Amino acid sequence: MSSLISFIFLFLFSSITASAQNTFYLYHNCSVTTTFSSNSTYSTNLKTLLSSLSSLNASSYSTGFQTATAGQAPDRVTGLFLCRVDVSSEVCRSCVTFAVNETLTRCPKDKEGVFYYEQCLLRYSNRNIVATLNTDGGMFMQSARNPLSVKQDQFRDLVLTPMNLAAVEAARSFKKWAVRKIDLNASQSLYGMVRCTPDLREQDCLDCLKIGINQVTYDKIGGRILLPSCASRYDNYAFYNESNVGTPQDSSPRPGKGGNSSVIIIAVVVPITVLFLLLVAVFSVRAKNKRTLNEKEPVAEDGNDITTAGSLQFDFKAIEAATNCFLPINKLGQGGFGEVYKGTLSSGLQVAVKRLSKTSGQGEKEFENEVVVVAKLQHRNLVKLLGYCLEGEEKILVYEFVPNKSLDHFLFDSTMKMKLDWTRRYKIIGGIARGILYLHQDSRLTIIHRDLKAGNILLDDDMNPKIADFGMARIFGMDQTEAMTRRVVGTYGYMSPEYAMYGQFSMKSDVYSFGVLVLEIISGMKNSSLYQMDESVGNLVTYTWRLWSNGSPSELVDPSFGDNYQTSEITRCIHIALLCVQEDAEDRPTMSSIVQMLTTSLIALAEPRPPGFFFRSKQEQAGPSIDSSTHCSVDEASITRVTPR
């Protein structure tokens, strides 16, 4: 949001309810760059527009949303109002009328204005604002109350997932509205609400809500963000009228009154009885197998809550037994968020146990994310999640055991790399490409990995690659193509420019990482190693681009191959990698195109453009160079506040 005003504001919530007749002003924003004179045609059209919005018939207010226009270009005015779904038509009309009467006082000479009230929103502009996403000039408001009985880092995790789920629900609904009740513990609950103007496309609504939800810090009880096209809010009381919106998800049904009470009692009692019987059956089975781990490969249900993967849960004592109490000799390695141990279950099945560090950057949100994401994935080039353990401060993931460690263990060791000839490496490149394609396109979800690197590619007995470490993965909604984040996580050197610098990521971000990975596989060199040896060379991407430009790409080839490779095949892979690391994300190919390029030599390849993070020599420099490389096997996480476009 290029003009987002972000500050802390103490809420005056004590006397506000969803059914209040008194309109409560929140905020407004005027466009000071476009103004009109009091006697102009635009002024006349604006007054006509506002009058029409405040004098509609009763049925028009019952819908809660109306648009209107007045005049002809260049003095045409477009306007709309949006009332909350849970308010009555009379409250809606009262709010719109009140807002109309205040517009010329708050924005007397401005051609554009947006006015936020507790019960409604009013907008007008000299541009077409109907069915057009606008996230400029918003307001972030937050209470000063700390979460009660909940740690702040846990509080964000508890709130963020339900709010994101509500955003997806709202985007897909006709009214573009959704609410959630979030249970913190037995005595505390939060209530969430998200909404968009109903004229928005599903994807525009979801993008708007994601921007707003991600701007909220979630470190206080109570917060909201107001944007022209959408809004979101959470607080520890029901600030909306529950009876007018239905029972929010995760809350218990409330009995009704009058003639419908019998129907409601039946509707409540019968499901509860069935649920009780199911629970009895489940607990009976679990009691019988209390000391036995579930060692079968589970199938997770659809949904983004960790509870849907309940059958994946392991007992901590059983994991301790499998790893000999995490004996150091069983330690396989250490990743960005904790240590990985080899374990053997009581059935004899070997597993890899990822024990997250208590001080690691991966909190419960990332932990839950990795469980939910990986549990849904079934592909030969993705590591299988067998289960998890969440007890006290322990957060543990149990994966299939992949015996040959990670790709970087072979690539960057002068002795071990001899085990990877070009034929094996070419198969590894193809396997990684197919795994990413599955994540992006062929699975039930659209998943952006965000941390593809050699250390996260595991190799099985036959040296087949398996993509691992989904803690930073993001699930995209239907038709979503890109997203923004304030928290840039991953490994510099593998990050695309738009992600590292602006927090913008998409499938093309993974494509960039794949390109870097291919260059490392071909050369046997780390992307960052060249900079450590010679700052003028920069990184592997820069070095490759210079070789390509000079017509000598074969100099990149790992000398350990000898003459055992096809020049045309390896040159084509370098060409594909350079297409993947182009600076502009739109220029990079999709993973489906990449797989076709790798398998069919008849497909003509476009000429690559200069890559992102290109280190220019003194002769090449047209400006300062950018150094974003770091050691490729260490996660360097950072926090970045971005300004979404």
From Swiss-Prot:
Example of a GO biological process term: response to salicylic acid
Protein residues bound to ATP: 332-340, 354
Enzyme class label: transferase
Catalytic activity: L-seryl-[protein] + ATP = O-phospho-L-seryl-[protein] + ADP + H(+); L-threonyl-[protein] + ATP = O-phospho-L-threonyl-[protein] + ADP + H(+)
Phosphotyrosine carried by residues: 399, 499
Membrane topology, Cytoplasmic segments: 284-645
Organism superkingdom: Eukaryota
Domain Protein kinase: 326-603
Positions of transmembrane segments: 263-283
PROSITE patterns hit by this protein: GNK2 (PS51473), PROTEIN_KINASE_ATP (PS00107), PROTEIN_KINASE_DOM (PS50011), PROTEIN_KINASE_ST (PS00108)
Domain Gnk2-homologous: 24-129, 135-239
Keyword set includes Signal: yes
Annotated Gene3D superfamilies: Gnk2 domain, C-X8-C-X2-C motif, Phosphorylase Kinase, domain 1, Transferase(Phosphotransferase) domain 1
Span list, region Disordered: 616-645
Inducing factors: By salicylic acid (SA) or by a bacterial pathogen infection.
Subcellular location: Membrane
Any one GO molecular-function label of the UniProt entry: protein serine/threonine kinase activity
Subunit relationships: Interacts with MWL1.
Family recorded in the similarity comment: Belongs to the protein kinase superfamily. Ser/Thr protein kinase family. CRK subfamily.
Name under which the protein is recorded: Cysteine-rich receptor-like protein kinase 19
Source organism of the structure: Arabidopsis thaliana (Mouse-ear cress)
Gene: CRK19
